[in-house]
UniProtKB/Swiss-Prot annotation:
GO terms for cellular component: membrane. The lineage of its organism: Archaea, Methanobacteriati, Methanobacteriota, Archaeoglobi, Archaeoglobales. Keywords: Membrane, Transmembrane, Transmembrane helix. It comes from Archaeoglobus fulgidus (strain ATCC 49558 / DSM 4304 / JCM 9628 / NBRC 100126 / VC-16). The keyword Membrane applies. It is found in: Membrane. The chain crosses the membrane at residues 49-71. It is a single-pass membrane protein. This is Uncharacterized protein AF_1617.
Length: 77
């Protein structure tokens, strides 16, 4: 037995259907389909970009720390 909820578009009762890891609200009256629960997959290229960004951020923080340390050490010599 399918669950039903009111359609946010027209207000009539719409059916909730499970497809894989997500639930879709389908309204037969107005033809609206909305994803209610779903996990968006992270693409491999996005993972690589995040890893590259983190590595670059760590390198830049190291450079900034080194420059700051050298400037502070220069003041006390």
């Amino acid at each position: 037995m399918a669950r039903e909820e009111p359609c946010p578009n027209c207000g009539k009762m719409a059916e909730i259907v499970s497809e894989g890891d997500r639930e879709i609200l389908r309204c037969a009256a107005c033809g609206t389909e909305r994803v209610i629960v779903g996990m968006e997959e992270i693409l491999p290229i996005e993972k690589k970009l995040v890893i590259a960004s983190l590595i670059l951020a760590i390198i830049l923080l190291g450079i900034l720390y080194y420059i700051s340390y050298q400037m502070i050490a220069h003041l006390y010599t």
